[in-house]
Amino acid sequence: MFHLSNHQANEHTDEAMNVGLPAASEQELSPIIQAKQLYNYKTTHHFFVGDESTVELFNALKGIALHNDHEYFGVLELHPDYEAVLSMLKLLIDSVPELPESPGYNAIQWMEDMHPNCWMAWKNATFYLSGAATLISRFQQYLVQKQVSYEQIRMISY
């Protein structure tokens, strides 16, 4: 579903990439380049929503957020076999079980269960929606109903 590797820091690559991200092979640059293009440097809070196909992208976005002293959080719909990946990568993202027949449903339910004070802290974040098109569409509709502006939502389908 996704490729995990052990990145090693390299100061020359960091300078070339212009950010404090780990060195990566040419094949691994895609999520890093994508993350740099998507990242909203104007906001300090970044919220990720997706499935297991988005772990590499969200890991790259995490690196940019931490480099800029920004906050990030999110929720991923995952098959239970992939939950260990989040802790391996030290991603501060919650996971909910995937429902192949209803992508996005469990992530939306997770948001609905969020404490109102927590929502107040994150409602002005930039939201990164990635993964299956149905998940993205459903979650975008949910955010718009919660009065999140379209300008705050960035979508990446796989």
Predicted features, each with a name:
Residues 1-158:
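Extended, composition-driven regions rather than compact fold-specific motifs
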